[in-house]
Amino acid sequence: MPSFDTVCEADFVEVKNAVENTAKEIGTRFDFKGTSAAIELKDKEITLFGDADFQLQQVEDILRNKLTKRSVDVRFLDIQKAQKIGGDKLKQTIKVKNGIEAELGKKLQKLIKDSKLKVQAAIQGDAVRVTGAKRDDLQAAMALIRKDLADHPLSFNNFRD
């Protein structure tokens, strides 16, 4: 029986490269000379440092630009509020989403069930497996998911025939 998995995964090699390129650009830009603007990546979490809000915003814009150039969807980023870390310095954490949350998985499962397509959806950890009798039904399910859940960075993998 044909099937595929719906997942929400960022390419962490490309995320790491984008963070490194952002750090390199911060080091060479004139407007960041003599400031504490920096960026680092630890365990699927990006941390931005700066002296003021506008610096954090500039670093974030550079990061978004680098991620887009590397074909990483910026919807994977979960941006937290900036925090003061002593003196006038600020820190902002950006979490990189990985895996489908339970709420989104249930929404996806309900969407497929309500569509009256001849496919079944099952939540398997941080992925949703969709199985059906025909490939055409699976392709219709993929089109439905792309259309209705366009605000989530979902991708399809693990195709089986």
From Swiss-Prot:
Gene3D superfamilies: 3.30.70.860, YajQ-like, domain 2 (3.30.70.990). SUPFAM superfamilies: YajQ-like (SSF89963). It comes from the Bacteria. Pfam families: DUF520. Keywords: Nucleotide-binding. One of its GO terms (molecular function) is nucleotide binding. One of its GO terms (cellular component) is cytosol. Belongs to the YajQ family. Nucleotide-binding protein. This is Nucleotide-binding protein Daci_4781. It comes from Delftia acidovorans (strain DSM 14801 / SPH-1). The lineage of its organism: Bacteria, Pseudomonadati, Pseudomonadota, Betaproteobacteria, Burkholderiales.
